Amino acid sequence: MKEEGTEMALQTMQKKNLNNPDDADVHGNIKKETITLDTVNVTRVTFDVGAKWSEDLKEYAGTESCQLPHVALVQSGRLKVVMDDGSEDEFAPGDIMMLPPGHDAWTVGEEPCVFVEFSQGNDYYRH
């Protein structure tokens, strides 16, 4: 049995391509390309080599660490994530990340990290 208000309001089949995003922006070494389907935002995020949230997005976000939750699939490269509580992990291709607010992240190695993130509402930074 579904809880009231948990079902999506999907009325028709939809298709979009991240190679033709509805919204795109670059902050330092981090690029974001977003499409929106109903209430779901799908964002391809590219952390170039040397990218670090606290250096590339901190000033823009206005917070000491990223305060947005993330659910994402890593497609290529590696990403190190350190939470405000000190816990940390490294994510590689095929890994699913589920991060609560309060973290920093940066690329590991000499390959950009690309991941696709799924969010709803205002769970992503807009330029």
List each language-model region with its residue ranges.
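A short, N-terminal "cap"/entry segment at the start of jelly-roll beta-barrel domains
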Residues: M1-T46, S54
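Glyoxalase I/VOC metalloenzyme domain signal
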Residues: L18, V49-A51, Q120-N122, H127
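A generic structural signal for short beta-strands and their flanking turns/coil linkers
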Residues: D38-T43, V49, H70, Q75-G77, ...
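Conserved short histidine dyad/triad with adjacent acidic residue
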Residues: R44-S65
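Short beta-strand segments in beta-sandwich/barrel cores
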Residues: K52-W53, G77-V82, A105
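Glycine- and acidic-residue-biased ligand/ion/polar-headgroup-sensing regions
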Residues: E59-D85
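Short acidic-glycine-tyrosine-enriched beta hairpin
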Residues: M83-G102
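Ligand-binding loop in jelly-roll beta-barrel domains
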Residues: P100-Y125
